Amino acid sequence: MTRYIFFSGKGGVGKTTMASATAIHYAMEGKKTLIVTTDPASNLADVFEQKIGHKITPVKGVDNLHAMEIEPDAATREYKERIIGPYREVMPEDVIASLEENLSGPCTTEMASFDRFIDFMEGDEDDVIVFDTAPTGHTIRLLELPVDWSKHIEESAKGTGQTCLGPVQTIQDSKDKYDRATALLKDHERTTFIFVMRPEELSLYETLRASRELKTIGIDSGEIVINGILPQDVCEIDFFRRKYESQQKVINEAQTAIKKPARHMFLRDNEVKGIDALKDVACDLFSGKKAASITKSEPRAHPDFVTDTPEVQKMWLPERGSKALFFTGKGGVGKTTISCIASVYASQRGFKTLLVTTDPAAHIGEVLDVKVGSEPVRVTDNLHAVMVDQEAAFRQYKEKVLNDAVGKYSDDMVAAMEEELNSPCTEEMAAFNKFIQFIEGRDYDVVVFDTAPTGHTLRLLDLPFDYAKQVEMMVSGDEMKEEAQNRFREIINILRDRERTVFNLVLYPESTPILESYRAMLDLKEAGIETQLVIANMILPQEVCANDFFGNRRRMQMKHLEEIKDRFNLPVMGFPLLEEEPRGLDALRKSLSSIRS
């Protein structure tokens, strides 16, 4: 056991459950244990069934265990005060105002959450600290930050002494802190990385990709947990027997490719919620249990779930002009597959369609079976696909800004701008700029956005509002200021226009994705954005639920489908669990029957 244990993996693979069960295990062994989540759309409180929030909170029912959810807004306030506080009594008001202006950028939120995360690594109050991280692409970004920011502070100290987080002298201590964090993350004696994956091709692909990326910054994974394995003895009919065989193939591939110790966790016949269920998972996780438990019950019939298909068609297809379709939700609910199906649907109806992914761990290329890059690639005559590549967007953005500046400003000013642009937070600005170009564009009738998991999508959608507020202080010149403000206002208007933009929440019928999607709907509403459709994915077909195990899971789903209708009060489209992951246009076209039936 190392002191620091990180859980990472593709969205929806069960990271929070495995991290929580691990924390419970060590707490029950008598070790003072803390579990911290760095996911902005945390499910920790949902899993433990108690309020946690942005403070270290005792977990009810487990001695020695505390938990905390790092809330970005609260972390930002704390971070700003930590930087500015010591100067309030000794510096003039204009200097304080300048510091506050520097710390008002959207990138400060990312930095603040990261800074709070490092605080836990430097504390000495706990024997074990378990980190439940955001889905893989965002976790990689988090773990790269100590290196990126340390380099940026060092380079800025040689130049103007300014960073986007303020003068170097005010954050020099942070550089030392980030250097220490980097050393800790690379220390195998003190830190363990555990990848959680499902026995599915896309999950394996994501795990291998993330493992390679971590190695480039000197971090090696310690082991893997393969979660959600179908028990062989319940796969009696062909539908599940074929799924079982497919899973076993992926499990063998994973153990050959990753060459790390692997723990196998079986799918349960009900969802994991509450301390008792987590203790059972902890027992299985650390005992190496090789059998699944099944609750015996009397089979009861449930009606199939009916959706309003014509209304869905009207929502997704433009009557005039262009339309943007956003698909968001918890990781692992099938956003990418549904986005690809929607794109194929619109393109086959004669609309020129662009599929855009904003997820750093994007895999639309694997689903479409084409190579997707930072420029739109042709899939069919009416369908193109593109990935918002943060590094490519950063290079393009930096080049454009500097080219525009040459001739308008002095060489010293251009050099200072280049130094500022080398900040890691410029990558976020560049990716956002690319994102809004696709919203503004007029080249396509339908633009489908396959977004990152919920918390990061809400962050992306907040950016037009954040940057609009900052234009006053960030842009010089009345003409430039008015142009920038008008651009952000137009983006906000497009996002709020129900005729031009449709927000679709994707979930599967279990408590955690329902609660996360509901919170996302409320957050969007607060920003003036109305959700128009809920897509309930992975519904078990009644005809394949021929035993207690799958009968129990279907009854659970039907109960939650009724809850979805009541809670959201929106049209609901149901998608069945597919026998295999769709790959390529033929498989996606076959899946269109879920819309047409």
Regions found by a protein language model. Name each.
Residues 51, 182, 186-322, 371, ...:
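C-terminal lobe/tail of nucleotide-utilizing enzymes
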Residues 1-13, 18-182, 314, 322-325, ...:
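Nucleotide-state-sensitive switch-loop elements of NTP-binding domains
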Residues 135-137, 199, 332, 453-454, ...:
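Short glycine-rich anion-binding loops that position phosphate/pyrophosphate groups of nucleotides
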Residues 6-8, 194-197, 325-328, 504-506:
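Short glycine-rich or small-residue beta-strand-to-loop segments that form or flank ligand, phosphate
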